[in-house]
């Protein structure tokens, strides 16, 4: 398939550049060492109810994760154990050197909310502008919500993709056989439709998978793997990593890589070529150690990056520089 062997760091990514590049100067990282480095949170949820902290903690596991337990929220169907005000989130992100982020949609409402949030963050006088943080949006239908009118939702997403250049990817989308909140045929239908949207608009694809590796990769093969495809919140082991990499996908590592029971994820991080990886928080879910169980936020990307750097056997400054360049190229920003 076209571009299947293309790596994020191996030359220009084809497709239209969407949005504007940030001119912000990197702040100091909050990570040990405190060197001036710049980080890119490639996957977070900062819109609407995600930051409110309303509702009960669902417990048990975040999207895509096989290495979670009590105290970690379950993703789009659960609320964080405490909300953080957006202005404070942005200030802490900037202080930690996180100057770019992608706000991810999971259904029609949160996708439109991501666009609205990013547009407001880019407006003159916004907290993000004041802090030097730049942001982009994605639109997608999470497998948990795949039974809620796939055709109508895909239509809304398609309109948003056509109308707004702040949207840099389709997703998150994929298959979740752990919770099975939607029938599996509906999940596969929604996933295939969004792969088609990524091809139609020449955009990146953000993939969610949990306990569904075979079917996820089968859908990608049958629909054609978009040239820029990332398996977000990667929670597989070396075998799953190799299968994804062989398809031309990029792996994005989250706070799961810091968990004591995620040795297989660290093995995957060790073998993944550094130009084929991104780092993310999946905020407000999956806070890294030592904050596990609390509401997560982009400022904690350096904690994820520090562990991935250790797995790679490189210093965190190189990991930060490389993954930031990877993310900018991957999303075309």
Which sequence ranges carry the predicted segments?
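Mid-domain alpha/beta scaffold segments of enzyme catalytic cores
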Residues: 1-333
């Amino acid at each position: 398939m076209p571009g299947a062997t293309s790596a994020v760091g191996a030359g220009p990514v084809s497709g239209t550049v969407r949005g504007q590049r940030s001119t912000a100067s990197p702040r100091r990282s909050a990570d040990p060492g405190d060197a001036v480095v710049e980080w890119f949170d490639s996957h977070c949820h900062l819109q609407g109810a995600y930051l409110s902290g309303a509702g009960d903690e669902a417990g048990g596991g975040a999207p895509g994760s096989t290495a979670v337990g009590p105290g970690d929220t379950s993703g789009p169907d659960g609320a964080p154990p405490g909300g953080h005000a957006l202005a404070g989130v942005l200030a802490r992100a900037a202080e930690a050197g996180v100057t770019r982020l992608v706000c991810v949609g999971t259904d029609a409402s949160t996708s439109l909310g991501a666009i609205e949030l990013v547009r407001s963050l880019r407006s003159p006088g916004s907290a993000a502008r004041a802090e030097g943080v730049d942001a982009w949006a994605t639109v997608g239908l999470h497998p948990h919500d795949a039974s809620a009118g796939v055709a109508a939702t895909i239509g809304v997403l398609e309109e948003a993709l056509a109308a707004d250049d702040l949207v840099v990817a389709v997703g998150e989308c994929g298959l979740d056989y752990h919770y099975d909140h939607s029938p599996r045929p509906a999940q596969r239908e929604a996933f295939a439709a969004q792969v088609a949207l990524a091809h139609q608009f020449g955009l990146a694809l953000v993939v969610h998978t949990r306990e569904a590796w075979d079917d996820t990769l089968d859908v990608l093969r049958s629909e054609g793997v978009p040239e820029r495809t990332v398996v977000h919140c990667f929670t597989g082991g070396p075998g799953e990593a190799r299968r994804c990499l062989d398809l031309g996908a990029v792996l994005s590592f989250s706070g799961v890589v810091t968990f004591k029971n995620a040795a297989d994820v660290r093995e995957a991080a060790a073998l993944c070529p550094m130009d084929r990886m991104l780092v993310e928080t999946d905020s407000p879910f999956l806070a890294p150690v030592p904050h596990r169980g609390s509401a997560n936020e982009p400022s904690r990307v350096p904690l994820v990056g520090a562990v991935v750097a250790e797995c790679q056997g490189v210093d965190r400054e190189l990991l930060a520089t490389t993954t930031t360049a990877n993310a900018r190229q991957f999303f075309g920003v």
